From Swiss-Prot:
It is found in: Secreted. Disulfide bonds join C5-C16, C11-C21, C15-C25. The keyword Ribosomal protein does not apply. Keywords: Disulfide bond, Knottin, Secreted, Toxin. It comes from Hastula hectica. Expressed by the venom duct. The presence of a 'disulfide through disulfide knot' structurally defines this protein as a knottin. The cysteine framework is VI/VII (C-C-CC-C-C). GO terms for molecular function: toxin activity. This is Augerpeptide hhe6.4. The lineage of its organism: Eukaryota, Metazoa, Spiralia, Lophotrochozoa, Mollusca. GO terms for cellular component: extracellular region. Coiled coil: none annotated. It comes from the Eukaryota. The keyword Secreted applies.
Length: 36
């Protein structure tokens, strides 16, 4: 089951590192993290 942290659709880093976090958020976070 997907989850978001609190009411913010953008999970904080600690949540996005958690495989239980929302997959869309995790994908966006990883994409932003790979940018210079």
């Amino acid at each position: 089951s997907s989850l978001h942290c609190g009411d913010d659709p953008w999970c904080p880093t600690g949540c996005c590192e958690n495989e239980d976090c929302d997959i869309g958020c995790k994908r966006d976070w990883e994409k932003s993290r790979s940018q210079p």
